[in-house]
Amino acid sequence: MNKLNKQNIINHVNNLQLKKSVPNFQVGDTVSVSIKIADEKRTRIQKFDGLVLRRKGSGLSETFIVRKESSGVGVEKNFHVHNPNIEIELKRKGKVRRAYISYMRERSGKSARIKEKVVNTK
């Protein structure tokens, strides 16, 4: 098998595993990620609501970081966009001018607010 055929097979398998319905979210948006957790006896869904700090990569390896404040402590989680065990729901569009808003880690209270993006639906 030559190299071109191997690459075609790899691309085909990757395309089969991509999610069909990924919401159009960006850095600065507020999302709710529902994580399906399989325990020994049952499966449950855990929600993680927060701000998207970064979206990175492409294809199956595309990831994003969500940050939230829980009991005064900042919590960040990395997720794969095409993970079959998560569902992403867009709650609010934010207006930022960076691809990675790491400065939000030092912010709290009113300084941690992000302007809401107004979307025209004409």
UniProtKB/Swiss-Prot annotation:
Leader sequence residues: none
PROSITE patterns: RIBOSOMAL_L19
InterPro entries listed in its UniProt record: Ribosomal_bL19, Ribosomal_bL19_CS, Ribosomal_bL19_sf, Translation_prot_SH3-like_sf
One GO BP: translation
The keyword Cytoplasm appears for this protein: no
Example GO molecular function: structural constituent of ribosome
Any single GO CC term annotated in Swiss-Prot or TrEMBL for this entry: cytosolic large ribosomal subunit
Key words of the record: Ribonucleoprotein, Ribosomal protein
Family recorded in the similarity comment: Belongs to the bacterial ribosomal protein bL19 family.
UniProt xrefs under PANTHER family: LARGE RIBOSOMAL SUBUNIT PROTEIN BL19M, RIBOSOMAL PROTEIN L19
Function comment: This protein is located at the 30S-50S ribosomal subunit interface and may play a role in the structure and function of the aminoacyl-tRNA binding site.
Name the record gives this protein: Large ribosomal subunit protein bL19
Native organism: Mycoplasmoides gallisepticum (strain R(low / passage 15 / clone 2)) (Mycoplasma gallisepticum)
Organism phylogeny: Bacteria, Bacillati, Mycoplasmatota, Mycoplasmoidales, Mycoplasmoidaceae
Gene: rplS
